[in-house]
């Protein structure tokens, strides 16, 4: 996946909570690309495994994002869910409802830095090839869990490659351009 991603990389974006546009933002300095659902046999196999493991229909997943971090690149602490109080999030919420969980898969070992940190709960996950971290965003009473604040620490040496799968409450159907 890394080799297939290299030629497609672009600066990563975030959803602008005011407009719903996808904007480059200084809090997120990685590059990335994505693979559409079942774009190739490897992607289809990964998506089936995620679905079986987590008990979530394949259709509820956003495209697999491949993210690349070079030395100094990071993603400052943020939430992956969309705050419904922000007007720009209406567009992304219409594409399958709220994001409910994230799966981050580590595609390589990082020489130094690049851990996934959860500052509010004191968890620091080292990026090790073949490992993954999964987290859901709702509390037992169905509220969005602000303790899922997380970030990608700056890479100090080497590079970091991850595959991220965001899961929605319903089938994901992006709006037509």
Give residue ranges: language-model regions.
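Fe(II)/2-oxoglutarate oxygenase catalytic core
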Residues: 2-177
């Amino acid at each position: 996946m890394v080799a297939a991603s290299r030629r497609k990389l672009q600066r990563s974006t975030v959803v602008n909570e005011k407009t719903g546009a996808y904007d480059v933002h200084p809090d997120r300095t990685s590059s990335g690309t994505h693979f559409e659902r079942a774009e190739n046999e490897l992607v289809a196999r990964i998506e089936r495994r995620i679905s079986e493991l987590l008990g979530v229909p394949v259709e509820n997943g956003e495209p697999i994002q491949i993210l690349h971090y070079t030395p100094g690149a990071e993603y400052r602490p943020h939430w992956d869910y969309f705050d419904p109080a922000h007007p720009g999030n209406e567009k992304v919420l219409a594409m399958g409802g709220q994001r409910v969980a994230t799966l981050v898969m580590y595609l390589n070992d990082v020489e130094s830095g690049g851990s996934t940190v959860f500052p509010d709960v004191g968890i620091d996950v080292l990026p090790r090839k073949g490992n993954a971290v999964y987290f859901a965003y709702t509390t037992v009473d169905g509220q969005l869990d602000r303790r899922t604040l997380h970030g990608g620490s700056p890479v100090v040496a080497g590079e970091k490659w991850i595959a991220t799968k965001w899961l929605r409450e319903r089938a994901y159907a992006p709006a037509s351009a």
